[in-house]
């Protein structure tokens, strides 16, 4: 049995921080200590920001993004290319694509992937909303920006089947060698995908 090194309030803070993706028990302890040491500069503003986020953040009823407005900033931006719809698994994927700033398109967040083993079926995802958005018209291309996992690819195939009969071009992200990547460090699946999706030079 491990010794208690702090009071229950600090232990609870560490336990909660450890639940944040990317933070294990050790990182959570470091983060908790840092927050406590920087109470005025960091801890108090952080708790205020978290309370405000909890009160104001909502899920966009159009695309599934999270924002302080509904519809979200992306959906209400008139400069967005409304004919292109990028389908992502989660909000974190949407944010990653936005950071890349490669396309000024609109998005649709599925809320996960099909996973029969985990009990996640089509009705558990925002697929009906996607089909409805496309059926309303105005979308000419759907980009399936899902992960290259078994579940991600199964979800992409299912969505493609659901879009049959609608006048929309369905594309997917290219898979292959990352920018700055060295072939020797890539796995066989990535190399095979890169060879199959090769382009003219």
Curated annotation (Swiss-Prot):
Domain of life: Bacteria
Disulfide bonds: none
Domain called Toprim: residue spans: 83-178
Keyword terms of this UniProt record: DNA damage, DNA recombination, DNA repair, Metal-binding, Zinc, Zinc-finger
PROSITE patterns with a match to the protein in the record: TOPRIM
Keyword set includes Zinc-finger: yes
GO MF annotation list: DNA binding; zinc ion binding
Start-end of C4-type zinc fingers: 60-75
SMART domains, per the entry: TOPRIM
A Gene Ontology biological process term: DNA repair
Function according to Swiss-Prot or TrEMBL: May play a role in DNA repair. It seems to be involved in an RecBC-independent recombinational process of DNA repair. It may act with RecF and RecO.
Similarity annotation: Belongs to the RecR family.
Record HAMAP family: RecR
Protein name as it appears in the record: Recombination protein RecR
Annotated organism of origin: Chelativorans sp. (strain BNC1)
Gene: recR
